[in-house]
Amino acid sequence: MALKTSEKALNTLCIDVGGTGVKIMLLDSAGKPLTERLRLPTPEDPTPTRVLAAVEKLKAQVPKFDRVAVGFPGVVKHGVIYTAANLHPEWVNFNLQTELEKRWKKPVRVANDAAVQGYAAIQGKGVEMILTLGTGLGSAIYTEGHLCPGLELAHHPWIKGKTYEDFLGKRGFKKYGPKRWNKLLASAIQQTAATFNWEQLYLGGGNAKEIHFKLDKNIQVISNEDGLLGGAALWQHDS
């Protein structure tokens, strides 16, 4: 979504924490990249200490910044992590916003990673939804460009007591194989359309490239870099 023209000339350090990789990029006030995307593998046993050590290594490679935007794979409220199913239990109740502000002396906003990615893609009209297909399953929904907080479709029961993430996350892809996974995804898309009445759906994440069925005109596969590019827009919305 286009940024407001009144936005001050502030550079945003965007961080995308994922189950397999930690990425950063520096954006200008218009949301355009000032650096290439930098990446390190998510550490084994990904505790806050280990993941933040990787973030620090990446941060050392970028120029000065004015503020920080973080996308995190779980439920986030006011900078505090409430769920981290694909990382480590130590993340639960960890105040990531406060920790980074203390370290870097810069203002920080933290939000669900799918929500941040969606900000880079949405048009700000009607009901729009994003599903991210990666290590887990991310989800976010927006009305007229505003995020509806709290959606965590991944762990909602779907088929025979198993969750959407059980089928559509990385483990589900490996278990069921590409053909079955695509059928499950098509079914999930139909379910979300009936439940949320979205007008536009965006599909992101590393496994979006594995989609092999024809998508309707109002369904769009988006770049994985949008997980970083949405960071500047996060500063124009409530986190």
Locate the predicted segments by residue:
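Short beta-strand scaffold segments in enzyme catalytic cores
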Residues: 22-26, 74, 119, 137-143, ...
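Glycine-rich phosphate-binding loops at beta-strand->alpha-helix junctions
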Residues: 21, 192-224
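Glycine-rich phosphate-binding loop and adjoining helix at the ATP-binding site
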Residues: 36-60, 64-68, 75-127, 167, ...
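A short, acidic, amphipathic alpha-helical segment used as a generic capping/interface helix at domain edges
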Residues: 181-194
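Short glycine-rich phosphate-binding loop at a beta-alpha junction
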Residues: 64-73, 199-206
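Glycine-rich phosphate-binding loop plus the immediately following alpha-helix
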Residues: 96-114, 147-184
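Short glycine-aspartate micro-motif
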Residues: 12-16, 67-69, 128-132, 202
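Short glycine-rich, Thr/Ser-proximal phosphate-binding strand/loop in the N-terminal lobe
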Residues: 2-50, 81-83, 146-174
